[in-house]
């Protein structure tokens, strides 16, 4: 039996490993690097963009077309390069991210999401196509993987406070400890 342990700030999907798993600018922080690595066996190209998405009550995601009251987006204040990367097997590259126009930021939290989308391979022009059977119909599905990570800008002191009260520690079935909130 073997166990592989990855640090908790790493995300991988579709052979793309991203670290750290979120971009956060607060205080005097004005730049950072995202590290991308291709963990697959083939060369892969990824397009990088910023999206506005939110989580729905059922846990799914939706694109934001109308912002909620008081909702602020970070995309106007973030510059990043390159906008696309091509990585060979086991290759890595850094994406430089900078906070811009910071003098225009009002106190509060700004949020967007970096979207890393794989770009399917296309055959070069002039390459001979394989002979096709013209007596049948076929369909070819090409999966396009994508992953998002949050980009957050925090300006000023946080006003969020949490208080837990009426906590109880119980033993369920006399063997399993359990916290209960009233």
Mark where each language-model region is.
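Beta-sheet-dominated interaction scaffolds and their linkers
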Residues: 11-44, 84, 160-182
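Surface-exposed loops/turns
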Residues: 26-27, 89, 106-107
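Buried hydrophobic-core signal for structured, non-transmembrane domains
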Residues: 32-37, 90, 97-99, 112-116, ...
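Short, hydrophobic/aromatic beta-strand segments
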Residues: 42-50, 59-60, 108-109, 162-163
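Short acidic, flexible loop segments centered on an aromatic residue
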Residues: 46-72
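Terminal connector regions
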Residues: 51-54, 100-154
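Intrinsically disordered, low-complexity Pro/Gly/Ser/Thr-rich segments with frequent PxxP/GP/PP motifs
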Residues: 66-103
């Amino acid at each position: 039996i073997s166990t592989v342990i990855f640090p908790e700030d790493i995300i991988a999907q579709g052979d793309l490993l991203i670290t750290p798993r979120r971009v956060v600018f607060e205080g005097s922080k004005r730049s950072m690097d995202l590290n991308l690595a291709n963990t697959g066996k083939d060369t892969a190209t990824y397009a990088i963009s910023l999206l506005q998405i939110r989580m729905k009550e059922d846990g799914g995601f939706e694109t934001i077309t109308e912002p909620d009251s008081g909702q602020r987006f970070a995309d106007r204040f973030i510059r990043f390069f390159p906008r696309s990367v091509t990585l060979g097997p086991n290759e890595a590259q850094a994406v430089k991210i900078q906070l811009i126009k910071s003098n225009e930021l009002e106190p509060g939290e700004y949020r967007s999401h970096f979207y890393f989308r794989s770009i399917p391979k296309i055959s070069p022009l002039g390459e001979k196509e394989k002979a096709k059977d013209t007596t049948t119909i076929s369909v070819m599905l090409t999966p396009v993987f994508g992953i998002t990570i949050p980009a957050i800008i925090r300006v000023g002191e946080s006003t969020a406070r949490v208080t837990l009260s009426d906590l109880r520690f119980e033993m369920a079935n006399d063997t399993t400890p359990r916290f209960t909130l009233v």
